[in-house]
Amino acid sequence: MKIAVLGDKDTALGFKLAGAHEVYSFEDTPLDMERLKNKLNELVEREDIGIILITERFVQKIGLPDVTFPIILQVPDKSGSKFGEEAIKEIVRRAIGVELKR
């Protein structure tokens, strides 16, 4: 299974250097947000993609498809995380069906 990354230029470069299989860079413009949405939908349909990483900022703009596979994880960009513990709990709950508690 492959890992795909959708993010801004800096995030994409970091994950490319870390060895992500497919990396796509987008700017924060209306045209690029449309391209991003199309690319995300394309990746969700592919059977060889197991994990999609997408920056939190872009998720706030385009939303996420309601799928159980591939796993879609939100990652912070260079400006830091917008979410936190609750978002991570929700990701785990959706991915494996277990609710994390303190």
UniProtKB/Swiss-Prot annotation:
<comment type="subunit">
    <text>Has multiple subunits with at least A(3), B(3), C, D, E, F, H, I and proteolipid K(x).</text>
</comment>
<comment type="function">
    <text>Component of the A-type ATP synthase that produces ATP from ADP in the presence of a proton gradient across the membrane.</text>
</comment>
<keyword id="KW-0406">Ion transport</keyword>
<dbReference type="GO" id="GO:0046961">
    <property type="term" value="F:proton-transporting ATPase activity, rotational mechanism"/>
</dbReference>
<dbReference type="InterPro" id="IPR036906">
    <property type="entry name" value="ATPase_V1_fsu_sf"/>
</dbReference>
<dbReference type="Pfam" id="PF01990">
    <property type="entry name" value="ATP-synt_F"/>
</dbReference>
<comment type="similarity">
    <text>Belongs to the V-ATPase F subunit family.</text>
</comment>
<keyword id="KW-0375">Hydrogen ion transport</keyword>
<keyword id="KW-0472">Membrane</keyword>
<dbReference type="GO" id="GO:0005524">
    <property type="term" value="F:ATP binding"/>
</dbReference>
<keyword id="KW-1003">Cell membrane</keyword>
<keyword id="KW-0813">Transport</keyword>
<protein>
    <recommendedName>
        <fullName>A-type ATP synthase subunit F</fullName>
    </recommendedName>
</protein>
<keyword id="KW-0066">ATP synthesis</keyword>
<dbReference type="GO" id="GO:0042777">
    <property type="term" value="P:proton motive force-driven plasma membrane ATP synthesis"/>
</dbReference>
<dbReference type="GO" id="GO:0005886">
    <property type="term" value="C:plasma membrane"/>
</dbReference>
<dbReference type="InterPro" id="IPR022944">
    <property type="entry name" value="ATPase_V1-cplx_fsu_bac/arc"/>
</dbReference>
<dbReference type="InterPro" id="IPR008218">
    <property type="entry name" value="ATPase_V1-cplx_f_g_su"/>
</dbReference>
<dbReference type="GO" id="GO:0046933">
    <property type="term" value="F:proton-transporting ATP synthase activity, rotational mechanism"/>
</dbReference>
